[in-house]
Amino acid sequence: MAIRYGTDASETINGDNTADMVFAGGGNDTVNGKFGGDQIFGDVGNDTLDGGFQNDMIDGGEGADKIYGGSGDDMLAGGLGADTLTGDLGDDIFTVGELTELTGDKIDGGIGRDTMMISFEDSAKGITFTAADPTKSTSFYGATITGIEQFFITGSDKAADNLTGGRWTDMLTGGGGDDRLTGNGGTDILSGGLGNDILSGGQGSDMLSGDEGDDQLSGSYGHDTLEGGTGNDKLDGGNGIDFLKGEAGNDTLLGGNGMDTLDGGEGNDTIDGGADNDTITAGAGLDKVIAGSGNDTVKMTINQGKDTVDGGTGTDRIDISGISGTFTAKAANLTNTLSDGTTIINIEDYTLRGSSGTDKFTTLGGTDYLYGEGGNDTLKAGAGNDFVYGGIGNDAIYGEDGNDYLDAGKGKDIISGGTGTDTAVIDASDLGTTAVTFSVSGNKGTLSNGTTTTDVEIYKITTASGNDVLKAGTAQQVVFNTGKGNDQLFGGNGSDQLNAGEGNDKIDGGAGNDTISDTGGNNTITAGDGNDTVTVDVLAASAGGDKTTVDLGTGNDRVEFNDGIGSTAGVFTANGGTGTDHAVIDRSKSTANLTFTLGTHAVLTNGNVTLDNFESVTIKGGSGKDVFKGGNLNDTFMGNAGDDDLQGLGGNDLLYGGAGKDKLTGGDGNDSIWGNNGSDDAAADTLSGGNGNDNLYINNGDTASGGTGTDSLYLDLSNVTTGVSFNFGTGTVKVNGTTSFTEMERLDFKGTTSNDTVKGGTLNDVLRGNAGNDVLDGNSGDDTLYDGKGNDTLKGGEGNDTLIREDFTGKDIFDGGNGTDTLSFAISGDTSVKLDLLNNALNDGMALGLTVTSIEKVIGSGKDDDIAGANVAEQIFGGDGGDALNGRGGNDTLNGGLGADKLTGGTGNDTFVFDDYSSAGDFVTDFKRGEDKIALDLSEFGLASNYKLLLVQGADPVATTTGATFFYETDTNRLWYDADGNGGDEEMHLVATFDKVASLSTSDFLFV
């Protein structure tokens, strides 16, 4: 950030294209921030301060100052004196330190969602304030304001305030006294402070805080958050999905419509969930809970008060913590009394969280959650799909009817699933080296620690480090997880997961699509029928002379093993069996010269891997000179270091040469071939695509041949310091003394750090200049060209090309050529764009030094831009930020994008596109009915493709249906959108203001 200091004399200080900090000093100064987010301090004197582009902070100081925010979200303070403050484009904030600073000020927020921040906390009198329509000028404590949408106001600490917001987001703080705060539209923040306050959010998703006192909070429409604070408060959520928290005091909480969350907090509270599915928490105190209609959940902790709970209609749940001893649920229409005197009625589902002692819970129908925690518990879930957790101890768990999930935890447990498809979870991880056996016969399962099961279909069992034998038997499905030890795992007919740890293991998957993993040891794995996946990790034990044999059986299977495999201490043998099978071999740590040719019987020479009946492979080589040959399907070979020879043969193969002088041959199929692994490689690689549409990636020193098909060359010379010059063609092209290619149809080029001259081919090429004074010519096709640093010349040629400016330090020439060509600043970083297609001498910011011809479409940056077209038809898209777009002559299409934009079509039949209404709306300066059109993006407005425009207009237009409606205010020239018409739940959103346009009709609109 450049820091600039003025003197006490009157002077002019100009910023640059970066962020400046300017202290103007005394005198009547003129300061122009220009580009960048500037900080400007006027000090004493009648100053003229202009922030220019981006988000500026300007303080006028003493004197009658003229302050212009320019584009961007600016923060403006006039200081003492009769000041003129203009926000212009962007969401600006006007701050006032003392009320006397407002005297004589003229404040205009301009275009955007602008905010006035002011505090009256020292006022002896209460403040009465109502936000005015921003289109109208109004007197405000000695100032004249217009164009202010939002107010952040702090009321008096000494008296009662009455503060009312507008259609946008307001922040109103009451201070002392019994205040009345009304948010109206927008996402408002209301804080009552001291006193007995009345807060109403209105439309929008508001946040209301009563703070101290006996407060009344009403959310009304929207998804609101209401917090009562201390005192006996009344909270009413209204419509929407609301969060209500009573906090301390005897509070009344009303959820209203919507799926609300209500928390009474401390005190004797009355909580009414209202309609929909609510979540209610009864805290400490004697609470009365009426869940209302819907499927509600009531949460409570026993012994915090004698509560009354009525679930109301719907399927309701009660969640009770700290319950101990015996509890038996009753029918929903009967009253159930807890040990602390709490009564429950109209509850269908239970969540019971037990104690460390011996608990006995019995529930009826419904979906119940029972937690035994510690102790020897008896848990009976009854009918329904239940979840039961025994915890530590010797528990008896009964799922009974339904598809139940029964987690016994640690201990000697009894598990009974009952009818339905039930799952048992057994944790034997505390048994250490003790061998564990498990088997299922008929409807009974037996674990050697004494745990028994009855009528369970699915098992999940975890053991420790003994020599375990786990058999699925007649189970539908199993998940076995064993640790160290010589284990035997047998799957069943389902899709099982069998995971063995270190040790000499035997695994049989059985039928079904199984997932099998093993770690270390001399292992025998039989996958069985089905499409199985086997992963072997012997890295930790590769020094122990391990041997692993895998038989995948029938099905389309996959086997994978890590870079420990193939060391001199380990041997791996796999048979794919029938089906289409794939093997993944990681030998990236090997130093040997590996060779492999895929076939019915294939051996990874020097890698101790044998594969039979595999149809495709993925192999990662090490630092040796590897030779890998694939088959007819899709193979992946990674050579890594060393001079490798990789041949894909048939299929769509992926070949990565890595470091070294590699020879890479794709063969048939659409292959992708990298001479390196995504990084620079000084060695000279030879790449051959063969038949098919191939992608070849090379850098300096490599040779590439595409072969037949439509092949793409990705040439990266970004680390080369000597420039190149070549024309892309079908014959042999010599890029420099060491790099060449032939039989390529498409080019993706990254230039050197010096001066490059490159001409593309007939297809859609990508040319990146990098550093240096480059000349890039796309030739024909729809090409994409990037300038980079230096004085560059970009020529699109034939086709619909895109020319992208990444750097503004050079003097560049962009010529789109024939076709509909695009100039884009979309990836230009943090600098705004000032572009004039008619007078390039005015170009500045990211367009500084740029000469442009034959451009039909412009895409701005992610900041606030000023873009003016020529006297021909153009498409101009502003992108993010508050943009100023001017089409000038021709039939132009203007789209401001995100942010509140200023749009001027100029002469011709222009189209104004609106695909966002999240800001304060765009401002159209010259819409002409009968010539220009308003284009609405249906998808961005959430409208169906067959939507028929519903337009209501007048001085105060009122919706006639609950359907999506557009409103045009004839007195303010504003176009609004309401997704639900007169439904009330959705707010109206400002789309645009059309200057001096008295009315609109449906014929002025079109959909895109």
Where are these regions (language model features)?
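Low-complexity acidic/polar repeat-biased segments
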Residues: 1-2, 143-152, 161, 344-351, ...
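Extracellular/surface recognition and adhesion modules
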Residues: 24, 107, 148, 309, ...
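Acidic glycine/aspartate-rich repeat arrays in secreted/surface proteins
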Residues: 122-126, 134, 139, 323-328, ...
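Short "repeat-start/strand-capping" segments in structured domains, especially the N-termini
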Residues: 17-20, 36, 147-151, 167-170, ...
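Consensus positions within tandem repeat domains that build extended binding/scaffold surfaces
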Residues: 10, 19, 28, 37, ...
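Solvent-exposed adhesion/ligand-recognition segments of exported proteins
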Residues: 1, 7, 12, 16, ...
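Glycine-centered beta-turn/loop sites at beta-strand termini
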Residues: 5-6, 15, 24, 33, ...
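Acidic/polar low-complexity surface segments
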Residues: 96-97, 123-142, 328-342, 429-451, ...
